């Protein structure tokens, strides 16, 4: 703790009070007796104890797909060994690289299948530096006791802004006019070009992105309807509708913000396009499986749909490159790109400097907390379990992290093993077939740690164990 100049601190406090007070307000500085206690108060703050794992070497992190530098900085500050690649890896190389790492960070192109994950003998957690987690075999990861984290918040604004840009671009046919002028054609027209003020935006999925989009759209004068499978409080004057058909019938623009699940696959197909207003527009910046693109193509050709903006596709190129978005990837590509007023972008919804920086911080922080403290808050496949950080004055305290099958009798078995020590705190929760127990036990020495580890390792319901001290 650095020394503190009490006089400077007192003067700074007085200046801050004077600047923040209203005209004529009377402010008094802290008493000298209070200021004299400041160093003692600051020194009394209990800083979180940096824990280390038992029976594990240095933590190794593998980062793929050009994960943001903010994540690398956070991991290196923790003392982890970081291996970084700008692109995804071929499966054979990925299998080789993943064998001895404790955590891996990916974006949307890397596929962590059961075939890959079965070779990851030391893997503790996975960080998806994006919203989606469908590129990870979550069931297999869970069965192995591997926690998976994502970034549900950080790119929400960037995606919402892209959709706003696409709404205006579709309404004014900006994509077509730009292409024409790039090829030397001057085509100044007003036919079928509209202001967005007074039009109705229908949002399918009113989560982090959908709700932010709602606020931005209303600020531009759009009326907002939204459909969600759960009842969600509206922001502003937006209104929730009870059925998807009602939203489709009433909306001039329809935008999707839903995850890729069996229930959302092709949720906009021929019947839904038929239910939409004549001349409506479709925007998909969520997942490539939620819109049936061949049906969309037919609806555009029939002049039922006046235009569409797509940022995601059922199959996407593994890396950047000319000619990679073609009919071999998706059989309808040539037909789609030939249509008028179709805006196609290469999955860039969250591709802003701000979003990637925030995602790096959000996911790297979650992974670090899980590695260092066992905190699983924010995991997409684990129960959310957390205990207060240990402090440095808890010298002989060990944190037990026990991931196990969700079957009867486990807590009794574990507590019998821990009963010779003082269990200071304990938290257990379950999620489907997996359960997670976290316990802080005191009065433990090095020989006790080894004995506890070996006993827990022999329990029949054990999936994985970590002891932090």
UniProtKB/Swiss-Prot annotation:
Supply the EC number(s).
Answer: 1.1.1.95, 1.1.1.399
Q: What GO biological process terms are annotated to this protein in UniProt?
A: L-serine biosynthetic process
Occurrences of domain ACT (ranges): 399-469
Spell out which residues are annotated as carrying Phosphoserine.
Answer: 22, 29, 33
Protein family according to the UniProt entry: Belongs to the D-isomer specific 2-hydroxyacid dehydrogenase family.
User: What protein is this chain from?
Assistant: D-3-phosphoglycerate dehydrogenase 1
InterPro entries of this UniProt entry?
ACT-like_dom_sf, ACT_dom, D-2-hydroxyacid_DH, D-isomer_2_OHA_DH_cat_dom, D-isomer_DH_CS, D-isomer_DH_CS1, D-isomer_DH_NAD-bd, NAD(P)-bd_dom_sf
Gene Ontology MF, one: phosphoglycerate dehydrogenase activity
In which pathway does this enzyme or protein participate? Amino-acid biosynthesis; L-serine biosynthesis; L-serine from 3-phospho-D-glycerate: step 1/3
Q: What else is known?
A: Present with 7670 molecules/cell in log phase SD medium.
Lineage top rank: taxon:
Eukaryota
Q: One Pfam family from the UniProt entry?
A: 2-Hacid_dh
Binding residue positions for NAD(+):
208-209, 228, 285-287, 311, 347-350
Encoded by which gene?
A: SER3
State the function annotated in the UniProt record: Catalyzes the reversible oxidation of 3-phospho-D-glycerate to 3-phosphonooxypyruvate, the first step of the phosphorylated L-serine biosynthesis pathway. Also catalyzes the reversible oxidation of 2-hydroxyglutarate to 2-oxoglutarate.
Keywords, alphabetical: Amino-acid biosynthesis, NAD, Oxidoreductase, Phosphoprotein, Serine biosynthesis
Keyword Signal assigned: no
Per the Swiss-Prot or TrEMBL record, the active site comprises 287, 316, 347 (proton donor)
Q: Where does the record place a coiled coil? A: none
Q: Which GO terms describe its cellular component?
A: cytoplasm
Catalysed reactions, as listed in the record: (2R)-3-phosphoglycerate + NAD(+) = 3-phosphooxypyruvate + NADH + H(+); (R)-2-hydroxyglutarate + NAD(+) = 2-oxoglutarate + NADH + H(+)
